[in-house]
Amino acid sequence: MRTIDSSSKKDGFRMPGEFEKHAGCYIIWPERPDNWRLGAKPAQKAFVDVATAISHFEPVTVVASSSQYVNARYMLSDEIRVVEMDNDDAWVRDSGPTFVVNDSGDVRGVDWSFNSWGGLVDGLYFPWDKDDQVAQKICELERKDRYRLADFVLEGGSIHVDGEGTLVTTEECLLSEGRNPQLSKQQIEMVLKEYLNLEKIIWLKRGIYLDETNGHVDNIFNYVRPGVVALAWTDDETDPQYEISKECFDILSNETDAKGRKLEVHKINVPKPILITDEESKGVDAVEGTLPREEGDRLAASYINYYTANGGVIFPLFGDPNDELAREKLQQLYPNCEVVGVKAREILLGGGNIHCITQQVPR
């Protein structure tokens, strides 16, 4: 693996849409007892279910720490590759590389700096040095050269692209004090355009209500295909989420993408508010410097946090009446894909969902 002193734009590489073909998918095995309840055992079962669902559509690699390797290997099917890799937590969407491709089919990784969603300002845990090495290690495993941006903080869950020059993100996240306070909005745009080969960036204001990642876009918005997008929605005007989703809808409805297309926006209603129970709260170890999980806290639940695989869509189930409505809507949006629901409350309790725990490798 080479570290290349250049940029995607200079070298003719672009970030493809997630709906384009994949060579495979990465997942990190959860274990932090101060984030995942009951020693991460319930979460591990949910991660197995996600990995298994995706493995029916494309190759899956699960990376696990040395102390969890044997356990992960035992719990996962033989079709899933398990590799030992140090990590601080299980959010490979954010700590892993953002892959870019060229017209010849070559793939490279963009290795952003990772600081646990806000560093010493409002990061979620410390230290995060193992997570900051995950992208490089995955590039090594995949034998892909990389671009390394040691001075630019970004998480993969904070961006979505259409593969044709347009990126969508949120001001709440990318302009937050804990990311790149030394850079202006225009300077941040310049970096993204240079390393992902973009022509236009659409800025939403905020992400899902109470999203602890400072409003990652992948929990509120997704690209179905170029020009067609999905948005988390609620019809309950008394819910704080309504104002946020309405604001996003208004922005998207009045924007055009890099190709000059008006966006076709499809709403997918979120479940009813999901709160942490007393039992769930007590199952998480209390550690200074880590975000606590308190009884009654509202979780940032959204069906938009799904993963698009080769011929499949893997989406979260919450035990809510809207589960089936979300399935129907996703099947309409992806008529040529098999839509698979996976029970995801245990992942949600850790602070994210299916899209957050996955990272695709394009081909």
Curated annotation (Swiss-Prot):
Its EC number is 3.5.3.12. It comes from the Bacteria. GO terms for molecular function: agmatine deiminase activity; protein-arginine deiminase activity. Transmembrane segments: none annotated. Keywords: Hydrolase. It is an enzyme of class 3 (hydrolase). InterPro entries: Agmatine_deiminase, Peptidyl-Arg-deiminase_porph. The active site is at 356 (amidino-cysteine intermediate). GO terms for biological process: putrescine biosynthetic process. It catalyses: agmatine + H2O = N-carbamoylputrescine + NH4(+). Belongs to the agmatine deiminase family. PANTHER family: AGMATINE DEIMINASE-RELATED (PTHR31377:SF0). This is Putative agmatine deiminase 1. It comes from Listeria monocytogenes serovar 1/2a (strain ATCC BAA-679 / EGD-e).
